[in-house]
Amino acid sequence: MSVHDEFDAEYDEAIDPDDLDDAAGAARAQAVTDFLARELVEDVDAIDVTASESRGEVTLLIHASPQDLGRLIGRRGRVIQAVRQVARAAGAADGQRINVEVAE
């Protein structure tokens, strides 16, 4: 069993996809962002995605280990831009505005 198989089994237990269908846009976006961040980095235990709301917009802050920041951001910010687009799409289903930032 590979590391990814073990992680997939653990992640499947933590978030039931059926629960996401009824979740609010912000919760769905947070779950999707957490999943994507964990798939991109080596130190999955260091990933923590926190949400805060201000003026009708939810900001998701991704905390990662310093050695994984480059993987999470990508060249010219392309990876984090893709994560932002997916998170925004997940939130848009319920009309929620989502912003994704990376903690340094």
What are these language model-derived features?
Residues 1-69, 82-104:
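RNA-contacting regions in translation and RNA-metabolism proteins
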